């Protein structure tokens, strides 16, 4: 009966969540996890419209609500339009997960410095700033920024990526201090090597080398990261956690 079903499903106030870079990988897993948990999810993508639509469709199949929004998080106009889309549709924004640009490339050219900074750091700043304006009015909100273990320990050939991700950690600590008086929690999640299209393409030698650096001896799954993000985004038990960096990397940064 309906009553039994209602009892089985815990009541959630359907928080409104914006997930950037949500068409694949970690972002997709986060969007699906939050959608399944009863959130209304804006699925942001930069180029992969078809994949993003699929994510939205899956959330709707779970009985959730979702909309897709194509936009570049390193462009202020796109970010403002994205937040406005969520507010126009659902009236508010409760949670923002800044995941766009979280691609762990093995090597990066120096010429890509600005591009990597714009996507990984400026994007987090712009999205956080736009969301905070909305959250401050209602004195409540949660922001989760996806950084990388590389931002903590560095990696040869990834100076730009490491600098951007370390920047996200420093930025988040400041944002947590600034948002605390308005009940806005800001935390960081630092994934290590997570199984993806890219790890699947690595040669056997490279894979062996990488797995050798991971004490648990395996890649993480996008769902591992999504589970931690869901806790930080929705759980009442996370309400007293702010300004913290959570490493989910199989032990790389021990």
Curated annotation (Swiss-Prot):
SMART domains referenced in this protein's UniProt entry, alphabetically: PKS_KR (SM00822)
Record-listed NADP(+) binding positions: 19-43
Pfam families in alphabetical order: adh_short
Stored InterPro entries: 3oxo_ACP_reduc (IPR011284), NAD(P)-bd_dom_sf (IPR036291), Sc_DH/Rdtase_CS (IPR020904), SDR (IPR050259), SDR_fam (IPR002347)
List of residues binding substrate: 148
GO terms of molecular function: 3-oxoacyl-[acyl-carrier-protein] reductase (NADPH) activity; NAD binding
Domain of life (superkingdom): Eukaryota
GO biological process assignments: fatty acid biosynthetic process
Catalytic activity: a (3R)-hydroxyacyl-[ACP] + NADP(+) = a 3-oxoacyl-[ACP] + NADPH + H(+)
EC code(s) of this entry: 1.1.1.100
Keyword set includes Transmembrane helix: no
Known partners and oligomeric status: Homotetramer.
Protein name per Swiss-Prot or TrEMBL: 3-oxoacyl-[acyl-carrier-protein] reductase 4
Organism: Brassica napus (Rape)
Gene responsible for this protein: bkr4
């Amino acid at each position: 009966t309906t009553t039994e079903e209602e009892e089985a499903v815990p009541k959630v106030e359907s928080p409104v969540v914006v997930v950037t870079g949500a068409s694949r990988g970690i972002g997709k897993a986060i969007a699906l996890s939050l959608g399944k948990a009863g959130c209304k999810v804006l699925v942001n993508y930069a180029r992969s419209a078809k994949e993003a639509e699929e994510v939205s469709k899956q959330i709707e199949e779970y009985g959730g609500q979702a909309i897709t929004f194509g936009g570049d998080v390193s462009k202020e106009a796109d970010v403002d339009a994205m937040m406005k889309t969520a507010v126009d549709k659902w009236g508010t924004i409760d949670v923002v997960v800044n995941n766009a640009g979280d691609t762990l490339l093995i090597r990066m050219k120096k010429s890509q410095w600005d591009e990597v900074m714009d996507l990984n750091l400026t994007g987090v700043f712009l999205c956080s700033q736009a969301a905070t304006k909305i959250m401050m009015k209602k004195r409540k909100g949660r922001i989760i920024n996806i950084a990388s273990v590389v931002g903590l320990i560095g990696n040869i050939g990834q100076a730009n990526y490491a600098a951007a991700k370390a920047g996200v950690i420093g930025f988040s600590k400041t944002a947590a201090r600034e948002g605390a008086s308005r009940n806005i929690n800001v935390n960081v999640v630092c994934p290590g090597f997570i199984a993806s299209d890219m790890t699947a393409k690595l040669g056997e030698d490279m894979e062996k080398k990488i797995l050798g650096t991971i004490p648990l001896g395996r890649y993480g799954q996008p769902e591992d990261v999504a589970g931690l993000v869901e806790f930080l985004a929705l759980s009442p038990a996370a309400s007293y956690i702010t300004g913290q960096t959570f490493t989910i990397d199989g032990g790389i940064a021990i």
